[in-house]
Every structure is written in C-alpha cells, then in structure tokens.
Curated annotation (Swiss-Prot):
Keywords: Cell membrane, Disulfide bond, G-protein coupled receptor, Membrane, Olfaction, Receptor, Sensory transduction, Transducer, Transmembrane, Transmembrane helix. The chain crosses the membrane at residues 24-44, 56-76, 96-116, 144-164, 198-218, 240-260, 272-292. This is Olfactory receptor 6C68. One of its GO terms (cellular component) is plasma membrane. Residues 45-55, 117-143, 219-239, 293-312 are cytoplasmic. Belongs to the G-protein coupled receptor 1 family. Odorant receptor. Residues 1-23, 77-95, 165-197, 261-271 are extracellular. PANTHER family: OLFACTORY RECEPTOR, OLFACTORY RECEPTOR 6C68. The keyword Disulfide bond applies. Disulfide bonds join 95-177. Its main location: membrane.
Length: 312
C-alpha cells in the first residue's frame, strides 16, 4: 500500500457510536479476551510440563494455542484501547503490520487444523506406526510448512497492496485493518487485488478443507470397522474436540470470505469478525480442556501439586 501524500493515518469506525453499547462491548471483549488468553496459556503450560501430554496431538494443540493467542492479540487489544480512549486513529504502518500478522496467524491456523486432522488419521488408522510416522522431527517440519504455506498465500496480494493509492478517504468501516474493508477506500483500481484476496481465501479454505474431509472419511471408515461400541466411542472421543473447533472456525469464515458481502451486510460481517477474533478462541480453549480427559487430568494433577507445595 503506497502512501499518498495526503493519507498517513486511517480512522477505524469500530462497531457502534452508542456510548452505552460501547461500555457493554468493552466489558464483553475484555472478559472473553482474558478468558481466551488464560485458557490458551494454561494449555501451553500443561502440554509443556505434563509428561503424559508429550505426544504429537498435544504438540499441535500447543502450537494452535499459540496461534490463537497471537491472532487475538493483533486486533482485540487495539480495539479495546480505541473504545476506552475514543482514539480511532491508526497509522499507516501500524495498519499494515496488523493486517500482515492477522492474515499470517489466521491462514496458518487453517493449515494447522488440517495437519491436526492428518495426525488423528494416523493415530486411528495406523496406530502401530503412529509414533514412527509422527516423530518429533516430522511434527516440527509440518508446523514449519504450515507457516511457510501461509506466507506464500498472503504475500502476493499484500505486495500488490503496497501500490494502492489513498487520496481522499481514510475511513475504514471496521474495528481493525482487514483486507476487504481497506480495499473499499483507495482511489486506484482494486479489482485485481480484490480477486487475489478472494482467491487466496478460497484456496486456503479448499486445500485445508479437502485435507480435513479426506482424513475424517478414512477415520470414520476405520472406526466403523471396530468390533465393540466402547472402542468406537473411545476413538470418536479423541476426534470430537478437533471436529468441533474445525466446525466453528470454518463455519464462521464461510460467512465472511465465501459469501458475497452487500453494503447492508457490512455490520453483520463486522459482528462475525468480532466472534472470530474473541469468542471462537475462547470457546476453543474450553472445548479442548472440558472435552479432553487427559488435559483435565493434567490440570487436576497440576492443581494438586500447587496445593501440596503451598501447604509446605
């Protein structure tokens, strides 16, 4: 995004001008943000410290938690600051940085979720070879590939964005620096970059969704062959948390990036963006902790150790 001499800052409109709604919105976002960060940090700490959680699945969960903390940190704190101070101005450079990291963390998360589905496929369909296939080196390589794939997808449209000119309007109808709202205000032609942004989003969505669907197709076929109901329940329970998180993530993003946005739907899209930025990460934390027996057991063991040390 090349800076025009007249534009060095942007104004973020946010979600509402109503003071009472802003107070409620601030409290809601602050609470959900703190719960999300606390939940993610708890998961990261448990997977690092508990020896029972030193498996590939929890290694990926640790990385997913880091990604979600990073993603929410790119936009929610800045929005909370804007609500509390009334300062809606963001500099050009800060906007570019926010856009880059939000896209990077968001796209990487999609690829990581696809990788986690492959991990579940190997664990259920090839249990005897699980630790050999999903070795520590392989897991680290797969995570690095997720980051590299995300970079390759976001850099082409972002590099084109540096050539955009902003003449008269610097008002972004959003609470953060998001690609589609930004592309509505340049005075130069944005048709090519808009197509690239949509193509990048669709490409990410389709590639990762195909991986997820294929993995779970084989998983379901394998589980249905298990002789006992108990075995089937146990196998499904190891996938339930991941399936729930995938459903929330993909379902919310379909609305914004796949469905065409009309002018009257802008406010709805902003609301969905808030859900993705704050509520989804918080829910994911509870899903992985409350529905996972090993994580719950590790959490209880950690509390017992802390209580025992405090009594000394």
């Amino acid at each position: 995004m090349r800076k025009h001499t007249a534009i060095t800052t942007f104004i973020l409109l946010g979600l509402t001008e109503d003071p009472q709604l802003q107070v409620l919105l601030f409290m809601f976002l602050f609470i959900t943000y703190m719960l999300s960060v606390t939940g993610k940090l708890t998961i990261i700490a448990l997977t690092m410290l508990d020896p029972h959680l030193k498996t590939p699945m929890y290694f990926f969960l640790q990385n997913l938690s880091f990604l979600e903390i990073s993603f929410t940190a790119t936009c929610v704190p800045r929005f909370l600051y804007s609500i509390s101070t009334g300062n809606k101005i963001i500099t050009y450079n800060a906007c570019v940085i926010q856009l880059f990291f939000a896209d990077l963390f968001g796209v990487t998360e999609f690829f990581l979720l696809a990788t986690m589905s492959y991990d579940r496929y190997v664990a259920i369909c090839k249990p005897l070879h699980y630790m050999a296939i999903m070795s520590n080196k392989v897991c680290k390589t797969m995570v690095i590939c997720c980051w590299m794939a995300a970079l390759m997808i976001i850099l082409p449209p972002l590099s084109l964005g540096f050539h955009l000119e902003f003449c008269d309007s610097n008002v972004i109808n959003h609470f953060g620096c998001d690609a589609l709202p930004i592309l509505k205000i340049p005075c130069s032609d944005t048709s090519l970059i808009e197509q690239m942004v949509v193509a990048s989003a669709v490409l990410t969505f389709i590639i990762t969704l195909v991986c997820v669907v294929l993995s779970y197709t084989y998983i379901i076929r394998t589980i249905l062959k298990f002789p006992s109901v108990q075995q089937k329940k146990k196998a499904f329970s190891t996938c339930s948390s991941h399936i729930t998180v995938v459903s929330i993530t993909y379902g919310s993003c379909i609305f914004i990036y796949i469905k065409p946005s009309a002018k009257e739907e802008v406010n709805i899209n902003k609301g969905v963006s808030v859900l993705i930025s704050s509520i989804s990460p918080m829910l994911n934390s509870f899903i992985y902790t409350l529905r996972n027996e090993q994580v719950k057991q590790a959490f209880h063991d950690s509390l017992k150790k802390i209580a025992f040390r405090l009594k000394k």
